């Protein structure tokens, strides 16, 4: 049962009891994931028990079991507690800054600011996994806090053809809105995992694709390719769902609409000399988060709003009468009335935010496609989807021009999906990055498990091969890498994310092999045996 009473978004403010826990929403009309219309609904938490579902290829050694209120929660790849608004200065700052950025990125959702971006692979994508921040203190060096986007610098040339990519300069406000809706996967949609089956179908239909399993061997028939790719993708998405929803169910973490409105009710956390100071309030940021003063258009007829917090962001559904013709635009609104860029009949998914399911699903799918096709890149080095002018957007009118979403690699598409949830207003970055890390691990592990079914020796003694498992993952930099169910004859090689081999020694004892290494730097590594590849996260 939820700790907090439901929030009714059409009313201002939020007086929830616990700002660290999920809050249901009460809507006049709710359209669920399947497109069903429910009148005056308060949707329950969807799938809180999913960590207890039988997995496809998840390793029980990566599972932690928790209990609360007599219920059992199985959590795979436990990322630990997200920052809480609890009076601790460090965690309060992490919480406040993360959710404040969601409102700030809402200011990018209008074409009227005239800001132009090149959204081709020339300028976006190609994010190094080594640049992924592992500590919250490093997040602001990865995300562009005020302008939007991440640290990706794009490609100097197409990695497949070696030709330059054609630039695509568009209005940022068109791009961000298209991105938010393209990856929304909300009501009446194929859902996030289904979205990656759509991408898989398009990849499989691309005439530039050579249908070789893992990029080598004989060309597969269309039927064999489809069966194997669907089997693998289905297993990977199943495990990603179990992992993400096990975490969601246990940590039961708050969503932006609840957190932003709650902090707005408390006041501001920047200037202790002002009467509206509260250490748990929103930060004051010129041009983005300010105080309503006398003479302000938001002051109210009786100046009842003086001293309240206002935000410069997407203005919400009060400014849209006809979504086929109207745009809410960006402007100053009371923070207590903040809305995410979503449908008013959906507003925010009815389950906890941490970790981002989109980030987990997408990264797992990208890793699986990379291994299955034998290449990290879309066929021909380009995946492309077109959002037509004044046709594509559903939440409001637009875009004002054709927008081509373009990606060189599967990981580029995954990274873009993760960013879209911040612009869409349903995830802060503290939900995003752990989902990416976990998805990258699940995608590889579950692929390896499924790929073992394609071995010609599956029904012989070699069936033991898929049982090789990492004793723990992630590990710390000075911790040995240990593999269980070994026989002492395996050959292991360790590589960093750049492909450089790391010198190691091995020690075998009673069906357990220890990989001995010099202290590893934080980052992602690949451990390979004759038959299996693991992606290892070093903290």
Give the label of every model feature segment.
Residues 461-539:
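C-terminal outer-membrane/trafficking sorting elements
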Residues 1-457:
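Acidic/polar surface patches and capping/hinge elements
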């Amino acid at each position: 049962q939820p700790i907090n009473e439901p929030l009714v978004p059409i009313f201002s403010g939020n007086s929830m009891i616990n700002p660290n826990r999920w809050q249901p929403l009460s809507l006049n009309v709710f359209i669920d994931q399947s497109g069903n219309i429910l009148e005056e609904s308060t949707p329950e938490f969807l799938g809180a028990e999913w960590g207890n579902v039988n997995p496809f290829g998840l390793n029980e050694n990566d599972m932690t079991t928790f209990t609360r209120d007599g219920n059992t929660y199985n959590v795979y790849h436990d990322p630990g507690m997200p920052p809480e608004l609890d009076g601790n200065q460090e965690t309060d700052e992490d919480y406040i800054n993360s959710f404040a950025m969601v409102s700030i990125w809402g200011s990018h959702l209008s074409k009227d600011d005239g800001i132009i971006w090149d959204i081709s692979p020339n300028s976006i994508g190609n994010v190094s996994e080594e640049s992924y921040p592992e500590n919250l203190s490093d997040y602001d060096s990865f995300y562009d806090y005020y302008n939007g986007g991440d640290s990706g610098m794009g490609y100097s040339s197409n990695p497949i053809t070696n030709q330059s990519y054609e630039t695509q300069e568009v209005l940022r406000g068109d791009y961000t809105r298209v991105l938010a809706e393209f990856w929304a996967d909300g009501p009446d949609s194929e859902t996030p995992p289904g979205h990656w089956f759509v991408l898989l179908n398009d990849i499989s239909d691309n005439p530039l694709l050579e249908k070789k399993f893992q990029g080598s061997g004989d060309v597969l028939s269309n039927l064999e390719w489809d069966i194997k790719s669907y089997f693998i993708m289905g297993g990977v998405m199943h495990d990603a769902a179990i992992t993400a929803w096990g975490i969601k169910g246990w940590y039961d973490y708050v969503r932006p609409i609840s957190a932003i409105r709650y902090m707005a009710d408390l006041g501001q956390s920047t200037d202790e000399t002002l009467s509206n100071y509260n250490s748990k309030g929103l930060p004051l940021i010129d041009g983005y988060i300010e105080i309503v003063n006398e003479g302000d258009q938001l002051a109210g007829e009786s100046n009842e709003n003086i001293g309240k917090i206002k935000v410069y962001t997407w203005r919400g559904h009060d400014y849209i009468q006809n979504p086929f013709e109207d745009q809410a635009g960006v402007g100053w609104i009371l923070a207590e009335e903040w809305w995410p860029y979503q449908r008013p009949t959906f507003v925010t998914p009815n389950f906890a935010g941490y970790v981002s399911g989109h980030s987990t699903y997408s990264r797992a799918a990208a890793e699986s496609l990379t291994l299955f096709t034998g290449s990290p890149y879309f066929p021909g080095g380009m995946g492309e989807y077109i959002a037509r002018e004044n046709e594509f957007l559903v939440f409001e009118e637009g875009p004002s021009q054709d927008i081509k979403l373009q990606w060189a690699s599967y990981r580029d598409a995954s990274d873009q999906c993760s960013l879209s949830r911040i612009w869409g207003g349903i995830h802060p970055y503290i939900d995003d990055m752990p989902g990416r890390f976990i998805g990258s691990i699940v995608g590889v592990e579950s692929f390896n498990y499924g790929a073992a079914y394609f071995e010609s020796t599956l029904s012989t003694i070699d069936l033991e091969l898929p049982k090789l498992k990492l004793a723990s993952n992630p590990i710390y930099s000075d911790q040995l890498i240990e593999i269980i169910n070994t026989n002492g004859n395996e050959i292991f090689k360790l590589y960093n994310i750049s492909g450089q081999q790391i010198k190691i020694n091995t020690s075998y004892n009673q069906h357990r092999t220890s990989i001995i290494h010099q202290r590893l730097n934080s980052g992602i590594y690949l451990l390979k045996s004759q038959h299996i590849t693991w992606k290892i996260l070093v903290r």
